[in-house]
Design a protein with these regions (language model features):
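Interdomain "pre-motor" coupling segment immediately N-terminal to P-loop NTPase/helicase cores
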Residues: 1-18
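Pre-Walker A (pre-P-loop) alpha-helix and adjacent loop at the N terminus of AAA/AAA+ ATPase modules
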Residues: 15-60, 119-120
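Walker A/P-loop
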Residues: 53-94, 124-125
């Protein structure tokens, strides 16, 4: 019994140290934003206990208040890979004014000059199936039918009932599990 209690105490001590480190990282990343930081700590705590897989959320606010800094310098630095102590890879996709879903999900490989989309590009570049992907300027996506296509692709990416089978048009028929 004492060995079991010692094991529980060691695990709790490790979690407590991690949460204190996460608090410091978030405070160093950006001043203020107490509500957002509290919510991020709650989400990270869920990841740490192993009961939460991928998670999608959004930051809202006027330009220049620190949304990108909170994600890049805060969240990405808080999430550490247990294998090599590296931080979670971070990728940035600005989509303001975009009017073509192929930017995200690729072009069919039969077209001359076709290529895979930005999502697959990030996975290959970061050599990771669960990087933090920050999609900026969602409110500025074209309101045309092509803009609706972009919103549909993004919905597929964040919907936990669908994102375990994302397909880039370039790699037609190959499911990518983005649920982690």
């Amino acid at each position: 019994i004492s060995t079991h209690i010692k094991s529980i105490n060691e695990k709790w001590s490790g979690i407590n140290k991690n949460m204190l480190r996460i608090n410091d990282v978030l405070d160093t990343a950006i001043h203020g934003h107490k509500t957002a930081k509290r919510q991020l700590k709650r989400i990270i705590g869920q990841w740490m206990n192993g009961k939460q897989t991928g998670y999608c959320f959004g930051f809202e606010g006027p330009p220049g208040v620190g949304k990108t800094s909170l994600a890049k310098k805060g969240l990405a630095q808080c999430l550490i890979n247990d294998n090599d102590n590296s931080h979670r890879p971070f990728a940035f996709i600005p989509i303001g004014g975009s009017s073509n879903g192929s930017t995200l999900s690729g072009h069919n490989y039969t077209y001359v000059g076709s290529t895979w989309g930005r999502i697959v590009d990030i996975l290959m570049e970061k050599k990771c199936m669960n990087p933090i992907i920050f999609i900026d300027e969602l409110d500025k996506v074209s309101r045309s039918e092509h803009g609706k296509e972009i919103i549909g692709i993004l919905t597929h990416l964040v919907d936990s009932t669908q994102n375990d089978s994302f397909q880039d048009k370039y790699f037609n028929g190959v499911d990518l599990d983005l649920s982690k």
